[in-house]
UniProtKB/Swiss-Prot annotation:
Positions in coiled-coil regions: none
UniProt entry tagged with the keyword GTP-binding: no
Protein's UniProt name: Replication factor C subunit 4
A Pfam family matched in the record: AAA
Gene Ontology MF: a single term: DNA binding
InterPro entries from the UniProt entry: AAA+_ATPase (IPR003593), ATPase_AAA_core (IPR003959), DNA_pol3_clamp-load_cplx_C (IPR008921), DNA_Rep/Repair_Clamp_Loader (IPR050238), P-loop_NTPase (IPR027417), Rep_factorC_C (IPR013748), RFC_lid (IPR047854)
Keyword NAD: no
Organism of derivation: Schizosaccharomyces pombe (strain 972 / ATCC 24843) (Fission yeast)
Function as written in the Swiss-Prot or TrEMBL entry: The elongation of primed DNA templates by DNA polymerase delta and epsilon requires the action of the accessory proteins PCNA and activator 1.
Length: 342
């Protein structure tokens, strides 16, 4: 009796737990019309979906702008109910050496599947630029042999890492970075659907940290809601683990006024929070671009200094000394010549 009661209680408890999808998947477009940005390229995919004759495709562009989603939407439009049987998707988490090309991909290409008239099986290779050169050479031959029944769609960040023989067999589509307005509109739609409490500076912070990456923006939005319940600038930067633009702005303002001691003190405060040199320099670059109070010529000089320091840091010299030298050079570039007269 007691066992039955306890099991029913546990059953109710388990049923009450709501497992929510990540918003990236929950709000992933399922038709081409819902994809944000890159209208011209999407229009070409719509023509392919309408005519039904899909060529081999290479879609390149930065992460989080809809490359894989576009291919999945195209596959759904072409195959309809036969999607599950007619599509093989391999992403970066799958082993994709020569053995996979020779065995798994070849086996799928040989498999007989009932598809709508005039349609082909589709093999989707996400992050194809991470495939080894040997695997790409093996893939080239597979593409040739099974082109009558199978089409390949490759998504990559850099198309130049795809070997030339594969590029020559494919139609290459290049996706551009999403604009801030496009990212903002999708975030507003999600906030409305999820009844999210947000502020304007919170949305601005999401856009700034995402840098055109829609996936990053949506992930940061969900993480901020889950962690704090309110999407404002401070909470977003805590979730994104990036230096606050307010602190960066204060440091750069001190540089602009030639107050080196205050600027170095602000830098030390940011450094003590544990941020890397790359994070600090990257955010300095973002903030300087938005500082309208600085004359354009001075801004260009500051951006030049920040860019040179960024290059040094990427070579491995990620020290506070490098950042301090940058701050001093920025302050010096804003000082008047008479300040140097002894």
């Amino acid at each position: 009796m007691s066992n039955a009661v306890s099991s029913s209680v546990f059953g109710e408890k388990n049923n009450s737990v709501a497992y929510e999808l990540p918003w990236v998947e929950k709000y992933r477009p399922i038709v081409l019309d819902d994809i944000v940005g890159n209208e011209e390229t999407i229009d070409r995919l719509k023509v392919i979906a309408k005519e039904g004759n899909m060529p081999h495709l290479v879609i390149s562009g930065m992460p989080g702008i809809g490359k894989t989603t576009s291919i999945l939407c195209l596959a759904h439009a072409l195959l309809g109910p036969a999607y599950k049987e007619g599509v093989l998707e391999l992403n970066a988490s799958d082993e994709r050496g020569i053995d996979v090309v020779r065995n798994r991909i070849k086996a799928f290409a040989q498999k007989k599947v009932i598809l709508p008239p005039g349609r082909h099986k589709i093999i989707i290779l996400d992050e194809a630029d991470s495939m080894t050169a040997g695997a790409q050479q093996a893939l080239r031959r597979t593409m040739e042999i099974y082109s009558n029944t199978t089409r390949f769609a490759l998504a990559c960040n850099q198309s130049n890492k795809i070997i030339e023989p594969i590029q020559s067999r494919c139609a290459i589509l290049r996706y551009s970075r999403l604009t801030d307005q496009q990212v903002l509109q999708r975030l507003l739609n999600i906030c409305k659907a999820e009844k999210v409490n947000y502020t304007d500076d919170g949305l601005a912070a999401l856009i700034m940290t995402a840098e055109g990456d829609m996936r990053q923006a949506v992930n940061n939005l969900q993480s901020t809601v889950a962690g704090f319940g309110l999407v404002n600038g401070e909470n977003v930067f805590r979730v994104a683990d990036q230096p606050s633009p307010v602190a960066i702005h204060a440091m750069l303002t001190a540089c602009q006024s030639g107050n080196i001691d205050v600027a170095l003190e602000k830098l030390q405060g940011i450094w003590d929070l544990g941020f890397s040199a790359v994070d600090i320099v990257t955010n300095m670059f973002r903030v300087v671009k938005t500082m309208d109070s600085i004359p354009e010529f001075s801004r260009l000089e500051m951006l030049k200094e920040i860019g040179q320091t960024h290059m040094i840091i990427l070579e491995g010299v990620q020290t506070l000394l490098q950042l301090s030298g940058l701050v001093c050079r920025l302050a010096k570039s804003q000082m008047k010549p008479e300040s140097f007269i002894i």
